[in-house]
Curated annotation (Swiss-Prot):
The modification Phosphoserine is found at residues 202, 213. This is Osteoclast-stimulating factor 1. Interacts with SRC and SMN1. Interacts with FASLG. InterPro entries: Ankyrin_rpt, Ankyrin_rpt-contain_sf, SH3-like_dom_sf, SH3_domain. The SH3 domain mediates interaction with SMN1.
Amino acid sequence: MSKPPPKPVKPGQVKVFRALYTFEPRTPDELYFEEGDIIYITDMSDTNWWKGTCKGRTGLIPSNYVAEQAESIDNPLHEAAKRGNLSWLRECLDNRVGVNGLDKAGSTALYWACHGGHRDIVEMLFTQPNIELNQQNKLGDTALHAAAWKGYADIVQLLLEKGARTDLRNNEKKLALDMATNAACASLLKKKQGTDAVRSLSNAEDYLDDEDSD
């Protein structure tokens, strides 16, 4: 009886490594990669042979080689976002690296893309259907706080258009508006908060009208 196929890896469970040496396959099933290549391990169910992808090719790698001859990359999506490396970010997403993973600071890749002013990275992350806009890190800051603090009005606008919340306060009780370092960011945030306030008031009036009509 053949053993069942391994379960597909869930996003975020992919392990990512950077090869320290070139690996020459001995069989057609094995994966060739060179020193410095990024390897995405998608199946570790076999203790001796792991399934991995490198440069669009998939194959088997001896697990002991990865353990001894490769460097683990803990937060590859975050690293790509910080550097503004769009091709690496796209490769991470194509290989099912989790889009909402948190680093040691509790920040998402989106936070770092906004912090660095990398508009193309932000737009690429927005193509992911489950992207979390309002995740607060250990300081309580969101991606919107980061963009406002660094003065990237174009990214503030992108976040607001996507539906980012303006009412979240960080650990210092500051809104993104309080963190804004230029007039353009402050203006966008004030306008959005004003629109939200009017909408909330309108909803409250509609609710009261409904109560009166009962």
